[in-house]
A protein has these predicted regions:
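Asp-box/WD-like beta-propeller blade repeats and closely related beta-sheet repeat scaffolds
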Residues: 81-139
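Signature of short aromatic-glycine-proline-rich micro-motifs recurring in repeat-based ectodomains
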Residues: 29-40, 138-139
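Predominantly five- to eight-bladed beta-propeller fold
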Residues: 1-13, 62-63, 110-111, 128-129, ...
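A short helix->beta-strand "capping" segment at the edge of beta-propeller domains
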Residues: 9-29
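Short coil/turn linkers that define WD40 beta-propeller blade boundaries
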Residues: 73-74, 121
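Residue position within the beta-strands of beta-propeller blades
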Residues: 44-48, 97-100
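Conserved loop/turn motif of beta-propeller repeat scaffolds
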Residues: 41-42, 51, 94
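Structural motif
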Residues: 54-66, 106-115
Length: 139
């Protein structure tokens, strides 16, 4: 983590410190404000890394979710490997990241629900929806 006092201004509350968490050529950003991305202890959280700072192309092979561990000096560890990873959520107990892998296409494709431990272990596929769903009324 790199201290960035230059990002604070006169409106910044006293005692607030600003740090840069990432380095490198690819932009990184928060996932989205209402997403459950913090572990219950607030010492670890998930952020988005990829070719676009805000918004994304879910087919971008550089796009991934990273775990930031503040107790390890802001160390970043990749959590997802798959192209199409989206909609991340940290479990209420803080042990897992749940996410979808979007390989959908009009009238075809697959949507997969996966999970991985925040330590990178116990990677599992939990459910797969393939092709058009009859209950949606699409052929």
């Amino acid at each position: 983590m790199k201290p960035r006092p230059d990002l604070a201004d006169a409106r910044t509350m006293p005692g607030v410190e600003v740090f840069q968490l990432t380095e490198g050529p690819l932009p990184n950003s928060h996932v989205y404000m209402e997403a459950q991305v913090f572990a219950p202890d607030s010492k670890r959280f998930v952020l988005h890394g990829g070719a676009y700072a805000h918004g994304y192309d879910h087919r971008d092979p550089k796009r991934k979710y990273l775990l930031c561990d503040l107790e390890q000096g802001g160390r970043l560890s990749p959590l997802t490997e798959e192209v199409g990873a989206c909609a991340p959520a940290v479990s209420p107990d803080g042990r897992f990241l749940y996410y979808f892998v979007d390989e959908t296409a009009p009238q075809d494709g697959r949507l997969t629900l996966k999970r991985v431990g925040l330590d990178g272990s116990d990677r599992r596929t939990l459910a797969v929806l393939e092709g058009p769903r009859p209950e949606t009324g699409t052929p």
